[in-house]
Amino acid sequence: MPVKRLREVVSQNHGDHLVLLKDELPCVPPALSANKRLPVGTGTSLNGTSRGSSDLTSARNCYQPLLENPMVSESDFSKDVAVQVLPLDKIEENNKQKANDIFISQYTMGQKDALRTVLKQKAQSMPVFKEVKVHLLEDAGIEKDAVTQETRISPSGIDSATTVAAATAAAIATAAPLIKVQSDLEAKVNSVTELLSKLQETDKHLQRVTEQQTSIQRKQEKLHCHDHEKQMNVFMEQHIRHLEKLQQQQIDIQTHFISAALKTSSFQPVSMPSSRAVEKYSVKPEHPNLGSCNPSLYNTFASKQAPLKEVEDTSFDKQKSPLETPAPRRFAPVPVSRDDELSKRENLLEEKENMEVSCHRGNVRLLEQILNNNDSLTRKSESSNTTSLTRSKIGWTPEKTNRFPSCEELETTKVTMQKSDDVLHDLGQKEKETNSMVQPKESLSMLKLPDLPQNSVKLQTTNTTRSVLKDAEKILRGVQNNKKVLEENLEAIIRAKDGAAMYSLINALSTNREMSEKIRIRKTVDEWIKTISAEIQDELSRTDYEQKRFDQKNQRTKKGQNMTKDIRTNTQDKTVNKSVIPRKHSQKQIEEHFRNLPMRGMPASSLQKERKEGLLKATTVIQDEDYMLQVYGKPVYQGHRSTLKKGPYLRFNSPSPKSRPQRPKVIERVKGTKVKSIRTQTDFYATKPKKMDSKMKHSVPVLPHGDQQYLFSPSREMPTFSGTLEGHLIPMAILLGQTQSNSDTMPPAGVIVSKPHPVTVTTSIPPSSRKVETGVKKPNIAIVEMKSEKKDPPQLTVQVLPSVDIDSISNSSADVLSPLSSPKEASLPPVQTWIKTPEIMKVDEEEVKFPGTNFDEIIDVIQEEEKCDEIPDSEPILEFNRSVKADSTKYNGPPFPPVASTFQPTADILDKVIERKETLENSLIQWVEQEIMSRIISGLFPVQQQIAPSISVSVSETSEPLTSDIVEGTSSGALQLFVDAGVPVNSNVIKHFVNEALAETIAVMLGDREAKKQGPVATGVSGDASTNETYLPARVCTPLPTPQPTPPCSPSSPAKECVLVKTPDSSPCDSDHDMAFPVKEICAEKGDDMPAIMLVNTPTVTPTTTPPPAAAVFTPTLSDISIDKLKVSSPELPKPWGDGDLPLEEENPNSPQEELHPRAIVMSVAKDEEPESMDFPAQPPPPEPVPFMPFPAGTKAPSPSQMPGSDSSTLESTLSVTVTETETLDKPISEGEILFSCGQKLAPKILEDIGLYLTNLNDSLSSTLHDAVEMEDDPPSEGQVIRMSHKKFHADAILSFAKQNQESAVSQQAVYHSEDLENSVGELSEGQRPQLTAAAENILMGHSLYMQPPVTNTQSLDQQCDPKPLSRQFDTVSGSIYEDSCASHGPMSLGELELEPNSKLVLPTTLLTAQENDVNLPVAAEDFSQYQLKQNQDVKQVEHKPSQSYLRVRNKSDIAPSQQQVSPGDMDRTQIELNPYLTCVFSGGKAVPLSASQMPPAKMSVMLPSVNLEDCSQSLSLSTMQEDMESSGADTF
């Protein structure tokens, strides 16, 4: 513990009472006044009573010697007091002020919380003003009367005065009783208030009486306490007197033995009376203090605290002046023979040492002293006693004589010892009774007793023989052991009481004062800790500085030339540092004074020696750092360094061990204003250091060039600057310099940073820097990326080459290390010391300073490197630019640790660089793969238009679940760009698709198509499961490209012909057979396909399975609807067959359908936001299309039929989360359908007004179509819904009427037009379908769904075809909701935007059925069909070529008879026009085309291939599917 701290612990009142003490105790030398306990806190009485026996004995023992030199001791004591007291007073005052600055409310915690809550409520909520109207009975009556009279008067219009008077009289008459009542109430209230006032008065009186009683009781208690205290004081005085008598007796006995022993030597006691007088004097002054002692716990605690501090202070003071006694004497000096005197002196010296030791022990822990003052006093006394006894025993043997004391004397000693023990025991018992106030006094008095017998024994032993001494030793040991036991017991009791009292006091303070006291204590403790730590550091730093000064002075003499050079550099550095780096003035000045002077005078060789020595000494390192900071200023990048940890250069360049110590130091430096803008440092250096560089160049030649060759050579002058060059090199300031002047500025920065060094760097760099370049390049490259990005981009350009230099530098730095050992390298040491000293220096604290100081040197070296690096800039410029800072750091790094260490960081950096390169390469590879895949697909499928829509489909499939917006962007022509150009609408989707699906896609496109075609049913089932998961997006992408050729075929006239041709009737039959056999599987496929078609347009892949899946998608409803559609869609299947190769055609019809679906996806995107829950089921369906993509290969013919059927089914599947097999789909679909059907009732109405409800209903549908719609028109979708509603609003009236009144007629007309519409589907869908979809679907949803669903149910139930329409009705119901939402979302805009590339394809296939149903029902069949024709034509025009695969879906009511009655040709042509209910359902179906946007309103003129086959097959498949799905259809329905 520093002495200063302990001195400051002295009580505040020392100075005040110093004079008083001198007056009161004229005989006591002032030095003892420190031992005098002064009042603490209240100051009501002196606490001297609490001081220990050591204080009394010290008064006795020091009495004579102090009297000899009273003036000296007095003056010394006064000085000590001045030193001790003033700082304490100042500190306490400051503490008080600080404590006062903090105002702490005296609330309980609960109250505080309540207040906080109230304040928060007030602050958060504006005051709510409540107007409370008091309704008095009188006023109320008057008001009522007045109102009634006014009402009467106003109608009558009588204004005459008589009427007014009558009214007033009536009012008075009516109010009179009320007034009376009020007066009565007032009288009663007054009486009550009087009673209350009386009660309050009585209460106050009672309170006063109680207060008086309590005050009297308290006074009595206080008096009793005072009496008790007085009694205790008297008792204590008596005991003390008794103890004094015992002490006198013991002293007499001792003197008797001594005199008997000394008789032979003719020495006689001379000073006994004086010693007794001293004892009396020293002991008695305590008595008045005892009487006056205040029993309050606080005073006792303070008294305990103060004496300890004072004792310690006196011991330190005594150490200072030999005249003052080191510790209070415990025994009066007795004349003894020379031997005895020597032994006494030895004992006194030992006691002094013991006291000093104890004082030091006490100083070790300030907090412990404060908390355990009494304990520390007793411990000191015990330790001193025990040590004195042991030492005295050692001293006895040489002093032993042949004299034997008489037995009586031994007995008397035993008796006295027993008495003293008994007295101590009695005191212990009585102390238990006494208050805590008396305890310290007794303990102190008890401490006195053990001391006397010890001394007496010592005196006795001197004259006794060995045998007598042995016996005496035994007796004394027993007595001492007893004493120790008693004292320990007493101390334990005292500690327990004192601790309890102290803790209670602390708790009381903490509880009563709450945080204020705690905060104050914390502040004081923190201040003590800070001051103590600062003092310790100051002392250490002083010694280190002194040693450094001495070493530097010795080195100064060695080289005068270097001194002059160093002085020049130092002066310049000082100017730079002052401008650049502000510091604490006191520390900065001192450090500069210590560092700059020696540094200037230090020769290079001496500096190296100092560095070696300084590395061992943290203080030297600190000086070097400070000096470096002063000379070089903080590195521009020091802020980054701080983040990097200690030195950025160290951090980048080499092993963490060395760089780590520096980094924290750098951080410390960084905390200050050390780091300044690069401009200031570089500019400042650029202005001045250039001149310095010229000087430096001159000085550098003086230094050996071997050192200069290394990059460190520029730092030669840096070593000359000061031993801190080690620190400079360690900080790796050069790296910072490079980073600061990253490029063109690098040479000036070097000049600036290491003012002398820049010249050396320039001169010596060419060889060394080149070498360094070769070695350092690697680390720089890795490092470059680390820092270059953080720092100036211009630096990046300059330092691109430096990275190469850094590699060479790392090698050269290793070389530099060897020259460093030579004195020549003294100039180089800034760099060399980087390597050597940095290891030690980094660990040292000086590194904090070094980074700043080395910054300049390092910058110089870096500049050299940069210059050299500039030559090899041609190498990795990009990396070097990034690593400009890194280069500088790496350069420093290699020297600081060995080159190998630098390579390690470079390896990490290189790893990062390699990772970045790999990421870029991977991205490039992926892009190239995408390009190649796009080209391969385009080559395989020559129709690029088809590729684009297929790509869009794949994108929509993958992106719809992810983001429908991407689908929108890609759904139009952008998809092909997306794949071909490698510009991803959704790069993640493309990458995922390409990476995961390349092999699968190629296999599927080339080989799997046919295989899948062969086994469509099985694949359909598997596809359902797999696609339900996330499998679809990956595969769908590849299948999508395969169907691409079909969309172009569909847009092409042959595609339309194919739709009409319906050549693949057999394939629909196959599909029908499949339906009959794998109704569930196909339905599952189709359920999957439909959502897939919605999202991905994958249903094209599963054309064969589609007809059954359409029926089975939603086992009940899909089976019916899908079968109906399949009947009609069977003609559509021939379209893909006719369009091109059956496998490709299947996929192609799928792809056109998929394209339509992606548009639907885009459409649905806008709705996805609203119906997320619905969309999620839809998203699972998109995976489903993946298997369907393979399936279409197997089921080529059915795919077209599937597409229309799949539209409703997909809508249904989207409605229901269940994308699994048909059975599982049935339940969820039924639930979803029921919900949607209910919602659909509301949806059309809401959509008509808002268009929001359909969006919610479309949640399930949103999977594909919904996402696509939302993609295209998220914001406009609502507006478009409104537009659609407006356009469709007219159609709604028509649709509603048509549905309700002309379902069959409309369906037939729609069918008739659908044939024509195939060509004009796009036109009507774009121009008019949105109207029909928005308004017509709304009406259809509301009216037809509920008006006609029973009809469709009956039809579907009655006929095998109809049951599927039922399922499909449900499907369409869900789909219709979806379509309505899609239309509402702005099928116009979506149709306009997406129908051109993709949505048209989707609309004709999947949505045509629902769209035609909706259109046919709401609009006059001809008009609506015309609209559809126009829409279809538009769709075809807008690269909706897949329109060929449009399914003409009639209302189910119409479809059932029409399908049964209509010839295959009619079936092909007949649009599947559902009943108004089915139209509602297909309004959901429209959702898909609506996603295409315009197609839903237009009838989907979907030519189902081979309607007859489907009619037959569907009848079978319907029967089977109805069996499977009809029940579920009925349930769901």
From Swiss-Prot:
Q: Does the keyword Magnesium apply?
A: no
Q: Is Phosphoprotein found in the keyword set?
A: yes
- Coiled-coil segments, which residues? 182-223, 467-501
The record's keywords, sorted A to Z, are: Cell projection, Ciliopathy, Cilium biogenesis/degradation, Coiled coil, Cytoplasm, Cytoskeleton, Disease variant, Joubert syndrome, Phosphoprotein
**Sequence ranges of Polar residues compositional bias:** 42-57, 560-575
What biological-process GO terms show up in the record?
cilium assembly; regulation of establishment of protein localization; smoothened signaling pathway
A Gene Ontology cellular-component term: ciliary basal body
This chain belongs to which protein, by name?
Answer: Protein TALPID3
